[in-house]
C-alpha cells in the first residue's frame, strides 16, 4: 500500500489532472473511512469470533483495489479504489490485533505487538523508498510502478489464508 500511496498525489495531479483540493478531499475521506470502520470491526470481530475471516476480508479488499490504481483514467476511479482500500484497512486492524492477543502467551504479548508494529513501520519506510527505486528503474512510468505493488498485496492474502490459524474458542 505504501508504495502506491506515496505516489498517488503526484499521479492524481500530474496524470489525471486533479486539483490539490481534490487530492485532499480524497485522502481525507479515505482516512476517515478507515477510522470509522475500525470502530465497528473490533465489535464485529468479538461478536463473530472469526478474526481470520475479517482479516482476510480486509486484506483482500485492499489487494483487489491495487490494480485499479494503474488502470485509473479518472479521479473517480482513484476515489473508489481508495475508499474500498480504506474500508479494508478498517476491517482488518482490530481483528488482526485481537488475533495477535489470542495466539500469543500473555508474557509475550508486548513483544508480539512490538514486532507487529515494527513490521508495519518497516513497510511504511520501505514502500516510499521502493517507489523511488522503481520510478528510477521504470523511467518515471508511474503506472508500471503501481503494477509492482499488486504482487505483494495478493501474496499477503495468500499467506494469511494458508498459514494463519485461528485458535479454538471457548464455548462459554
Regions found by a protein language model. Give the residues of each.
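Symmetry-related core transmembrane helices of the 12-TM Major Facilitator Superfamily/SLC fold
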Residues: 143-161
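Cytoplasmic helix-loop-helix junction between adjacent transmembrane helices
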Residues: 81-122
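Helix-to-loop junctions at the C-terminal end of transmembrane segments
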Residues: 37-50, 135
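Helix-loop boundary and gating motifs at the non-cytosolic
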Residues: 1-35
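Residue-level signature of mid-helix packing/kink "hotspots" within the transmembrane helices
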Residues: 31-39, 124-125
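Transmembrane alpha-helix termini and helix-breaking/packing motifs in multi-pass membrane transporters
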Residues: 10-15, 126-146
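Structural signature of the two symmetry-related core transmembrane helices
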Residues: 53-68, 150
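Helix-loop junctions at membrane interfaces in 12-TM secondary transporters
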Residues: 68-82
